[in-house]
Amino acid sequence: MSTSRKLKSQGTRRGKNRTPHKGVKRGCSKRKYRKSSLKSRKRCDDANRNFRSHL
């Protein structure tokens, strides 16, 4: 039971965190990364992580 629970929590967490991050990084890097500096990209990533975790 413990293994199943661990796998479930990890899978849901990873799936939710991994896919959006990839899409965000790709979309952000194409549009904002070129225009602004690395600091901005980090901020966008952080905001997205917070937004996703709340969702």
From Swiss-Prot:
Task: Point out the coiled-coil segments of this chain.
Answer: none
Q: Name one GO molecular function term.
A: DNA binding
Q: Name one GO biological process term.
A: flagellated sperm motility
* Compositionally biased tracts (Basic residues): 1-42
Q: Which GO terms describe its cellular component?
A: male germ cell nucleus; nucleosome; nucleus
Q: In which tissues is it expressed?
A: Testis.
Q: Where is this region: Disordered?
A: 1-55
Q: What is its main location?
A: nucleus
Question: PANTHER family of this UniProt entry?
Answer: SPERMATID NUCLEAR TRANSITION PROTEIN 1
What is the protein named? Spermatid nuclear transition protein 1
Natural source organism: Ovis aries (Sheep)
User: Gene behind this chain?
Assistant: TNP1
